Amino acid sequence: MTTTHTRNLWWRHLISFLIAPVTMTLVIPALIVIAAGIRAPDLHSPITIGLVTVGALLIAVGIGLLVWTVALFDRVGHGTLGVGNTLGEPVQLVVRGPYRQVRNPMISGVLGILLGEAAVTASGWLLLWFAVFVAVQLIAIRFWEEPHLHRRYGAEYAEYRRNVPRWIPRISAWR
């Protein structure tokens, strides 16, 4: 990858990241918290402390997975998490790191963050947002993303799809 390519890609990374992960994991949950009047958890209860701890761990793992997969899109795929030429989706299929175990580790990271937020706040509203997000992803990935990836990467994606599960990670890495 050339220096010019890297310079031209930084703003695409920023826009892609702001459009998808930041909106889904920060903006929408913040609006829900404000609209529902959700307050900070009362840390006097062992159950609440447990929920906050588990939630914080889910958020940390989710952020780590999200950052790792975005970095792989850049370094291996030479693109961003954006779709189409404008935002620079990867020109090469990414089949490294967590992509060897599961086809959607980036979404898994976002799911970890959303579920963690629901746990930390003990909010049914944020749990509902998590469920809505899952439902939308189930439909979008199956009926839009996978056909798009098949058209873009052809036989390489077909082989990847046959060998790596969509949601439940493989125990051993593929390849």
Where are these regions (language model features)?
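Solvent-exposed interhelical
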Residues: 99
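Extended, alpha-helix-rich binding/interface surfaces that flank or overlap catalytic cores
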Residues: 104
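Membrane-anchoring alpha-helices and their flanking helix-loop junctions
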Residues: 1-96, 108-175
